Amino acid sequence: MFAWAGDIDQKGNDFLAVIDADPGSRTYGHLMATTVTDQQTGQVHHTEYTMPASGMLFANDHVAGRTFVFDVRDPLHPKVAVSFTEMAGYSHPHSFLRLPNGHVLASFQNAHAPGTGAPDAGMGISGGLVEIDDQGQLIRAASTADPKFADAMLMPYSLLPLPGIDRLVVTNSSMHDIDPIGHTYQIWSLSSLKLLRTEYLDTGGDQDGDVNPEEPRLGPDGSILVQTLNCGIERITGVATDHPRAKLVHMFPGSHCGVPTIVGHYLVQSVPIINGVVVLNLANPGKPAEVSRLELGEGLAPHWTGWDAKAERVVVTGIGDLHRLFMLKLDQKTGAITLDTAFHDADGKVGFNFDNRQWPDGWTGSANPHGVVFSR
C-alpha cells in the first residue's frame, strides 16, 4: 500500500511510503520503499481513495496547493510523473475521483478573483470542478457558483460520480476556518458537467448534523450517504429526479469525523472523540445502527479509512501525537471490527511507525500520514 506523508515540523518534504500490506508476507507491516518529492511539507492531504486502473496516483499537499501524479505501476519504485498547481482559474484541489473514461474529476476549493490571478479575500465562497488526465492536462472545468445561492458557501470538498444515471453529487465545505460554514450539496449532470441544482442538507433540528458536509459515498441501496464534519450521516435520495431529499439519519459523538468507508452493507467511520472507529449496519439505510466500535488509543484522532478487498483489511490514519498507521479486520458478516495485531513494523509494535525514524532517503524525523491507497 502507498501512504502519503509529510514532515510534522514542515521542514522536510512530502513523500510516498510503500508499506507491505500482504498478510501472508513475512514483512507484513514493514517499510519497503519511499519516494520523496521536491515539495516542502505544507499539509499532506488527500490521495485518490482507491488505486486507479492506470496506476497513475494523484496526491495533494493542500496548503501548498500542489498535486503530484505518481507512477506506481512498479510498486517498489514509484516515481513522480508530473505535478500541477492551479488550473482553469481554480486552486487548492481537495478530492480526486475517477470517471469512466479514466480521467480524474477534482474538486478545487478556490476561484481566483477575476483578472488578478490571486484568490479573493477569505479564499472566496465558490470553487470549481476540473477534469484532468493522467498527464496532468486540463480537459474541462466548471464553476460551482450558483446565482440562486449567492450567499451560500459553495466551495467543493468532495464528489461522487454516478455514471449509471448521469449524475454527480458534490459536497460544499471549506478547508479554511476563516470561510463560512457549508450546509449544501449540489447535483450535476456528469456528461455535460452542468450544475442542475443546489440543495440544503437536513439540520436534524437542533443537532446541526448538516455542518460542513464532506464525503459522499454510494450506499448499498443506491442512496447517497454523506459524512459531515459535525459527525452526521446525511442520506440523499432521488438524485436523478427533480425532487432530491436529504435526511439526517445518524449522529456520531463529537465532531471532526473524517473519511468513511463502505464495505457491503457496513459503514466504517473514523470518530476522533473516541480515538477510534465505529461501524454502522446499513441494512436499513434510513436508520443505520451501530454494531461495533474500536478504540485505538489516546494520542490518535483517526481521520482516513480505506478498504483493501484483497486482504479484507481497513487502514486507518489520523492526526495527533501518535504517528502510526493501523490495519483493522472487518467481519463482513457481523460488522465486528478488530485490530490486526499481525500488522507491525520492524519495531515489533502493532501498526506502522511514522515517528522519529530514519527513512531510506537519508532523512530522519517524524511524519504524519494522511491518504492511503492499496495496490491492485
Please identify what each model-predicted range represents.
Residues F2-Q10, A106-S126, V170-T184, I319-Q332:
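Short, conserved, GDST-rich strand-edge loop motifs in beta-rich repeat architectures
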Residues V18-T27, V69-P78, D133-L138, I187-L196, ...:
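Short loop/turn segments immediately following beta-strands, especially the blade-tip
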Residues T27-T37, K79-E86, I139-D146, L195-D202, ...:
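Beta-propeller fold detector
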Residues E312-R313, T317-R376:
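Blade-level signature of beta-propeller repeat domains, shared across WD40, Kelch, NHL, RCC1
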